[in-house]
Amino acid sequence: MTTNYIFVTGGVVSSLGKGIAAASLAAILEARGLNVTIMKLDPYINVDPGTMSPTQHGEVFVTEDGAETDLDLGHYERFIRTKMTRRNNFTTGRIYSEVLRKERRGDYLGATIQVIPHITNAIKERIIEGGEGHDVVLVEIGGTVGDIESLPFLEAIRQMAVDVGREHTLYMHLTLVPYLAAAGEVKTKPTQHSVKELLSIGIQPDVLICRSDRAVPANERAKIALFCNVPEKAVISLKDVDSIYKIPGLLKSQGLDDYICKRFSLTCPEANLAEWEQVLYEESNPGGEVTIGMIGKYVELPDAYKSVIEALKHGGLKNRLTVNIKLIDSQDVETRGEEMLKELDAILIPGGFGYRGVEGKVLAARYAREHNIPYLGICLGMQVALMEFARNVAGMENANSTEFVPDCKYPVVALITEWRDEDGNVEIRTEESDLGGTMRVGGQQCHLTEGSLVRQMYGEPTIVERHRHRYEVNNMLLKQIEAAGLRVAGRSADNKLVEIIELPDHPWFVACQFHPEFTSTPRDGHPLFAGFVKAAGDYQKRQVK
């Protein structure tokens, strides 16, 4: 099998949506029967995003095999069926770490280690390794052309055309085509200069994606084609849209997939986008709306909860409901109390780290429990629900987690010091372990309790969901909590770790230690989010009555 590579770069400004554009193109190519995957190359020095602030970098997306990756990989999995792995994302930091490790071992036999060829070779090796077994690999280069940090990656992808053949490489460049109200027209000069910058590196783009708040007129696209040495049919207008799931259709309508298939000499049927048309139909024809409050500590940057937000929308699609998400700072709940939680049809508490805002989350969990409001707790959201129940129902005064109060009397949540990974190897963690790369992370089996609400929603006895945490329910105190009315609805494969809890006497109160948002997609949804949004709609109807 010959693998073809599409390298996606961005120019003029950041945040043009390279990841969405790449994922949308991948969705069309997949719909043509091609085996497609997507990679993200990040130019920052961090080894991975695992220890980066969510308010700076957004969420950390966890893959099935336990890699902590860029949030763009979440977009990739929501658009295509291929599951991402640790091969699909790497950073400058990881590349340099590997090269330096080899140098220390003496692998380079005393050679002077340089960016070219050692760093660029390592990058190319990673790209080729990640693309094995696929017809087409889309490779998104993080950052903006012109950034110093991106230069080794750009040089590596320039060399790829030499290594694998120009006929198997395509360069797709996203640029901004701004509209100037004073002039009453779009301006192409920024795009021309961005392409000039790319040419100075040795890369001639084959496709230009022109991002604008409106459709770029044909005459302006012809002008861009002339000055940038790109065929007119390869200059694509990509305007702002109210739903990212419209983008595959927009790209297909301009023949981008046909152009690429011809460029790679690929013979494949026309793309069938019926599934995406169904998603858009469900999105544009809701039967009602619900308001769900998300109580978090990183709410100033919604991207910190990107997959949760998307999963809630997917749950809305499956119930033909528009989901209005109200982001609420958990510290505001601490200071202003229950007034922050009124007018909500459901409450969701997502994952997080650190004690700041935790008591606000505990208060929100109590409010949901006492007022029969649907509640979904994820990761830390399960732990605070357990703390709240232990304190106010099970009689464990000031019950807490050892993450926040190490010497508390009732440590209902405690550090996992030992477990087995997916290969059966024993993992050991202590308070002294590094923060990076030391969590229980990735896909883990969970056995669902017969007769539980979650068993009913999933429709099967065993599931696999993705984790990212260090702390777990303390089994030593579990019997007292269960005796007070809490039900364990799911356990780990070895039956030692509590994965899901429910309140049988509550209309819909579910909390899980894993992150179900990472496996939700617009086409398939997710059982927990579909059930949660349905419960929000049912609660709203009860309130009206």
UniProtKB/Swiss-Prot annotation:
SUPFAM superfamilies: Class I glutamine amidotransferase-like, P-loop containing nucleoside triphosphate hydrolases. One of its GO terms (cellular component) is cytosol. L-glutamine binds at G352, L380, G381, M382, Q383, E403, R470. Keywords: ATP-binding, Glutamine amidotransferase, Ligase, Magnesium, Metal-binding, Nucleotide-binding, Pyrimidine biosynthesis. It is an enzyme of class 6 (ligase). Residues 2-266 are annotated as: Amidoligase domain. CTP binds at S14, D147, I148, E149, K187, T188, K189, P190, T191, Q192, K223. UTP binds at S14, K187, T188, K189, P190, T191, Q192, K223. The active site is at C379 (nucleophile), H515, E517. Residues 291-542 form the Glutamine amidotransferase type-1 domain. Pathway: Pyrimidine metabolism; CTP biosynthesis via de novo pathway; CTP from UDP: step 2/2. Allosterically activated by GTP, when glutamine is the substrate; GTP has no effect on the reaction when ammonia is the substrate. The allosteric effector GTP functions by stabilizing the protein conformation that binds the tetrahedral intermediate(s) formed during glutamine hydrolysis. Inhibited by the product CTP, via allosteric rather than competitive inhibition. Mg(2+) binds at D72, E140. ATP binds at S15, L16, G17, K18, G19, I20, D72, K239, D240, V241. The keyword Ligase applies. GO terms for biological process: 'de novo' CTP biosynthetic process; CTP biosynthetic process; pyrimidine nucleobase biosynthetic process. Its EC number is 6.3.4.2. Gene3D superfamilies: 3.40.50.880, P-loop containing nucleotide triphosphate hydrolases. GO terms for molecular function: ATP binding; CTP synthase activity; glutaminase activity; identical protein binding; metal ion binding. Homotetramer. CTPSs have evolved a hybrid strategy for distinguishing between UTP and CTP. The overlapping regions of the product feedback inhibitory and substrate sites recognize a common feature in both compounds, the triphosphate moiety. To differentiate isosteric substrate and product pyrimidine rings, an additional pocket far from the expected kinase/ligase catalytic site, specifically recognizes the cytosine and ribose portions of the product inhibitor. Catalyzes the ATP-dependent amination of UTP to CTP with either L-glutamine or ammonia as the source of nitrogen. Regulates intracellular CTP levels through interactions with the four ribonucleotide triphosphates. Belongs to the CTP synthase family. This is CTP synthase. The gene is pyrG.
